[in-house]
């Protein structure tokens, strides 16, 4: 009897070497995670599946077509760059983002390095200019220091810098006209990006940098266009938008707006290289009803046959302008169409950010280990 007890106890005490090694590794991992949290604070390191928010929150751009192209809008807690030629709608696009933030009770700041902000035009786009924080800095260092302090406060939801090209280093301002300061602006931007990026993620503030285009000298093949301020902003930006004017809108001989095309040149939080088009009306900004009509037609909520647009089998307007006028006059139908459009656009978009969880749960259901791809050691 005693021999049987000894054999049972010895078999229970002996564990396979792999399980013993795994237990030691788990214990060591829990110890080091606890040590890191004690040294650097809770939340300094975590498993991705334990995060309270898996999906990146967004700020609406003010254009429904661009929201779709970006996967919801500008991501919170990220750097965004908007660049394009002159009079293409860069400032208008960011003023609409400011208006959207203020509508939701947020705080927005506008760092006007170009000293060209028109408060009357901003108010016509829906910006609450009385509560908008505005700074017109003298130097690039001053502008970026203001941006850094606003981000550190964690009290501002959106900061717009207009523009990177106007962030003049102090050495260039204090020097004489014609002095060469090669790379001074690029060094300034590189240092600023290193300094503010970590604080942006912690505060949840979105920072939008507007940028201008320049031409590279001596480029025969490829695109000669480049943006100012060096390459640092290109790397640190989660989203880069290339905005262009593709058409001038006319009624007879009178010009009343432009048609803008935005290409998502870079996107870390959604699929990139999508394209959005929308109308920008002079004195009014982005045509929200025009965006709604475009998306309703694309999702077959509103159909078009020839010049006639129809909704629920009834003709609502002949031509685009008349249909937009009908949407303005019929607010109930407009709200219903907008609700249907947003439902169509969000179908199937709620997907977990942790791609290993569905794989592991499916494997457990089948009582088989998850299949992992092996990495070949062969050179």
UniProtKB/Swiss-Prot annotation:
GO biological process, one term: DNA repair
Domain of life (superkingdom): Bacteria
Major location (coarse): cytoplasm
Keywords carried by this UniProt record: ATP-binding, Cytoplasm, DNA damage, DNA recombination, DNA repair, DNA-binding, Nucleotide-binding, SOS response
Region ranges (Disordered): 1-24
Biased composition (Low complexity): 1-14
Gene Ontology cellular component annotations, sorted alphabetically: cytosol
Binding sites annotated in the UniProt record for ATP: 84-91
PROSITE patterns reported for this sequence: RECA_1, RECA_2, RECA_3
MF-aspect GO terms: ATP binding; ATP hydrolysis activity; ATP-dependent DNA damage sensor activity; damaged DNA binding; single-stranded DNA binding
ATP-binding listed as a keyword: yes
Coiled-coil regions listed: none
Subcellular location: Cytoplasm
Pfam families tied to this protein: RecA (PF00154), RecA_C (PF21096)
Similarity field: Belongs to the RecA family.
Reported function: Can catalyze the hydrolysis of ATP in the presence of single-stranded DNA, the ATP-dependent uptake of single-stranded DNA by duplex DNA, and the ATP-dependent hybridization of homologous single-stranded DNAs. It interacts with LexA causing its activation and leading to its autocatalytic cleavage.
Official protein name in the record: Protein RecA
Organism (species): Prochlorococcus marinus (strain SARG / CCMP1375 / SS120)
